[in-house]
C-alpha cells in the first residue's frame, strides 16, 4: 500500500542509535550485522557492536517522532492480557515524547480476533454486543478516555453511509451481533477500499481533540 505522496525508501533496514544512522545487514540464518550508514555511502566492513539495552530506533520512528501518533494494536500485537496491551501503548506514547495521540480500537468482529479469543457476540447477560463496548474496547476507553475511538462501532454505524452503500438484511443481523458489514471487508480481518476509506474518519477524532482544523 502506498499513500498519496509516499515514495518507497531507497534503503531498507535503516535504524538510528544515539542520533547516528546505521544499516542492518545479513540474515537470521547467516547472522545479522550492523554498520554505519549515510545517504552518500555505506561501509559494510565497519561492523558495530550493539550492547544490551541499547535503544535502537527504526528510521520511520526516529524521523516521525514528533508527529501525531495514531496507534492500533490488533491481532498481531503479541500481547497476552489487557495489562500488557496497555503497557505496550504506554511505552510507544512515552517513547515518542508526544502528547498528541489517537488510540484506534480493533476492527475484528467480536469472537474472531486471534489476539483476544475470550470475546464473543454476547454480553454476560446474554444480550448481543451490538454497538456496545467489548471488554477489550472498554479497557482502552478507560485507559485513554477521549483519545480512544471505537472504530468497530463507528464502522457499524457510519461505514456504509460514508461510502454510499446501503445495508442489507444480513448487515442488520450482523450489526446486532456487533459485526461490521461484509460490504466493507476484503476478508475476515482486512478491509476493502470502502472499509479503509471509511476508516479514514479517524481524522475527525483528531479534529475533536484539537489536532487538526
Describe the function of each predicted region.
Residues 5-213:
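Alpha-helical cap/lid subdomain in secreted, periplasmic
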